[in-house]
Amino acid sequence: MTQFASPVLHSLLDTDAYKLHMQQAVFHHYYDVHVAAEFRCRGDDLLGIYADAIREQVQAMQHLRLQDDEYQWLSALPFFQADYLNWLREFRFNPEQVTVSNDNGKLDIRLSGPWREVILWEVPLLAVISEMVHRYRSPQTDVAQALDTLESKLVDFSALTAGLDMSRFHLMDFGTRRRFSREVQETIVKRLQQESWFVGTSNYDLARRLSLTPMGTQAHEWFQAHQQISPDLANSQRAALAAWLEEYPDQLGIALTDCITMDAFLRDFGVEFASRYQGLRHDSGDPVEWGEKAIAHYEKLGIDPQSKTLVFSDNLDLRKAVELYRHFSSRVQLSFGIGTRLTCDIPQVKPLNIVIKLVECNGKPVAKLSDSPGKTICHDKAFVRALRKAFDLPHIKKAS
């Protein structure tokens, strides 16, 4: 499999914004923490045959580095400190941190090393896997087909929103990790830029080159790692929320709620956190139920929900986003992050349902017990039981 050996990636910034935001926080607070992460294909795709091609791409990634113009652009953003950016200038991907193999047809990938370095592998590696697989499966598919599909969806979207006040509707591109290709994502984002309700992208490379706002705060791994960083498991989620505010006291204030279910999150999300964080992000479970819980929680704490933002990002498409907007727009600020349904929405192309998730921190297990049982990941059943007990979740379904 060498016919497509040219590198998929061309920029270190071709990744999700929250990876750099988290990396800076890890650089400042957890420099010596080590982690391990593993690849999962949630579908039935046998991707092992692509292992050699993916391994080639992993090797090519060691040549990526922060360019001078990229460094200058990051320096002008309010999020980053000079010590981190100077370190990032010297950063190089280390392929020795990645093992890729074909396990009886299944693609097996494991990452391990210092968290400050390993943290950057996930998004570009998933984008590489997605693009390599689609290159082989759909060699005749091109950007025009993706754009035609989007134009058709935008016509439907206009009809769906006719007569609706869309002034509070905000859409973001979250499509890097499962995109059909880098070229498709850029084309889709350029088209969406023409719409007044499109507010930005999670992709730092596209944000820089297209003069867009980079969007993103933190991911599940921030909360998962704290399960072992925090000396008290029951306090680990609060420790993660507090450490984030230490790094970003006045910005990047959207908290992810489903590392250990929304109910457990809200028990930890008291009035100080709820006041200081700008809002919450939904990534699993029923979105209407979740949003109602969030609004009720703010009201219970005496906080006006209209002063907060709910971000929906779980398996969204334009139609679902409009339904949620109709339901919630009069009561709370809203943003919608759409990924796969924008950047891999092409007839006859099956998007990959692939993830890379943290499984260990400092040699000990971590877990994600989300509001969608199929998204649960952990090897260690005893640790899952301990986590359920610590967060008073006796009925959570077992880890898969």
From Swiss-Prot:
GO CC terms, sorted: cytosol
One Gene Ontology biological process: NAD biosynthetic process via the salvage pathway
Catalytic activity field: nicotinate + 5-phospho-alpha-D-ribose 1-diphosphate + ATP + H2O = nicotinate beta-D-ribonucleotide + ADP + phosphate + diphosphate
Signal peptide interval: none
Pathway: Cofactor biosynthesis; NAD(+) biosynthesis; nicotinate D-ribonucleotide from nicotinate: step 1/1
Keywords: Ligase, Phosphoprotein, Pyridine nucleotide biosynthesis
Pfam families (alphabetical): NAPRTase, NAPRTase_N
Enzyme class, first EC level, given as a word: ligase
InterPro entries per the UniProt record, alphabetical: N/Namide_PRibTrfase, NAPRTase_N, Nic_PRibTrfase, Nic_PRibTrfase-Fam, Nicotinate_pribotase-like_C
Changes after translation: Transiently phosphorylated on a His residue during the reaction cycle. Phosphorylation strongly increases the affinity for substrates and increases the rate of nicotinate D-ribonucleotide production. Dephosphorylation regenerates the low-affinity form of the enzyme, leading to product release.
Modified residues (Phosphohistidine): 220
Keyword check for Hydrolase: no
EC number(s) per entry: 6.3.4.21
GO molecular function: nicotinate phosphoribosyltransferase activity
Family membership noted in the UniProt record: Belongs to the NAPRTase family.
Function according to Swiss-Prot or TrEMBL: Catalyzes the synthesis of beta-nicotinate D-ribonucleotide from nicotinate and 5-phospho-D-ribose 1-phosphate at the expense of ATP.
Name of the protein described by the UniProt record: Nicotinate phosphoribosyltransferase
Protein species of origin: Escherichia coli (strain SMS-3-5 / SECEC)
UniProt gene name: pncB
